[in-house]
């Protein structure tokens, strides 16, 4: 596209506006574009308001419940992945012992102390929306954070 000068300015501006508004109408007014999403969200808010709930609830107890559920879900995913890693390491270690080959050079296991747990839980509760820390306590989550597996590296297969 040539530089804007006195002779081509109007035609470039015309084609720019024509393409811009064509794509704007095509993207936003097809029902699935930006305007379509806003219509869907408005309808969803109306339907939920009839049930007595809204999407953006201002109730701090419901926010704490959501945070508690999210934290427990994250911990369960972490445990599931760590369990799979430990099972894989045990299987590879047995395979290596049978063939006299060391496949894993270093496998570390760090046991979290209660002081570290309290520090983690304190930092998480400090960042809660209500800033009271009621949504997470050491009694409920002390047994959730006990063991962290760290795979440091792999050796070469000989």
Curated annotation (Swiss-Prot):
**Annotated GO biological process:** ATP biosynthetic process; proton transmembrane transport
**A molecular function (GO) term:** ATP binding
Q: Where, by residue number, does the polypeptide cross the bilayer?
A: 7-27
Primary residence:
mitochondrion
Q: Where in the cell is it found?
A: Mitochondrion membrane
A GO cellular-component term linked to this record: proton-transporting ATP synthase complex
The membrane topology noted for this protein in its Swiss-Prot or TrEMBL record is:
Single-pass membrane protein
UniProt keyword annotation of Ion transport present: yes
Q: Could you say which EC number(s) this protein's record lists?
A: 7.1.2.2
Q: Which reaction does it catalyse?
A: ATP + H2O + 4 H(+)(in) = ADP + phosphate + 5 H(+)(out)
Q: Name one Pfam family in it.
A: YMF19
Keywords on record? ATP synthesis, ATP-binding, CF(0), Hydrogen ion transport, Ion transport, Membrane, Mitochondrion, Nucleotide-binding, Translocase, Transmembrane, Transmembrane helix, Transport
Kind of enzyme, top EC level? Answer: translocase
Family membership, please give it.
Belongs to the ATPase protein YMF19 family.
What is said about its interaction partners and assembly?
F-type ATPases have 2 components, CF(1) - the catalytic core - and CF(0) - the membrane proton channel. CF(1) has five subunits: alpha(3), beta(3), gamma(1), delta(1), epsilon(1). CF(0) has three main subunits: a, b and c.
Q: What does this protein do?
A: This is one of the chains of the nonenzymatic component (CF(0) subunit) of the mitochondrial ATPase complex.
| PANTHER family per UniProt | ATP SYNTHASE PROTEIN YMF19 (PTHR36816:SF1)
The name this protein carries in UniProt is Putative ATP synthase protein YMF19
């Amino acid at each position: 596209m040539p530089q804007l000068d006195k002779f081509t300015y109007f035609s470039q501006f015309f084609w720019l506006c024509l393409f811009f508004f064509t794509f704007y109408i095509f993207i936003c007014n097809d029902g699935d574009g930006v305007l379509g999403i806003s219509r869907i969200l408005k309808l969803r808010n109306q339907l939920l308001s009839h049930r007595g709930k809204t999407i953006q609830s201002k109730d701090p107890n419901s926010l704490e419940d959501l945070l508690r559920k999210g934290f427990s879900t994250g911990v369960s995913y972490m445990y599931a992945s760590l369990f799979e890693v430990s099972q894989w390491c045990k299987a590879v270690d047995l395979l290596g012992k049978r063939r006299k080959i060391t496949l894993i050079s270093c496998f570390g296991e760090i046991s979290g102390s209660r002081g570290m747990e309290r520090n983690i839980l304190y930092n998480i509760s400090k960042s809660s929306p209500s800033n009271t820390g009621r949504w997470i306590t050491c009694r409920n989550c002390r047994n959730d954070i006990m063991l962290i597996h760290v795979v440091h590296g792999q050796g070469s297969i000989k």
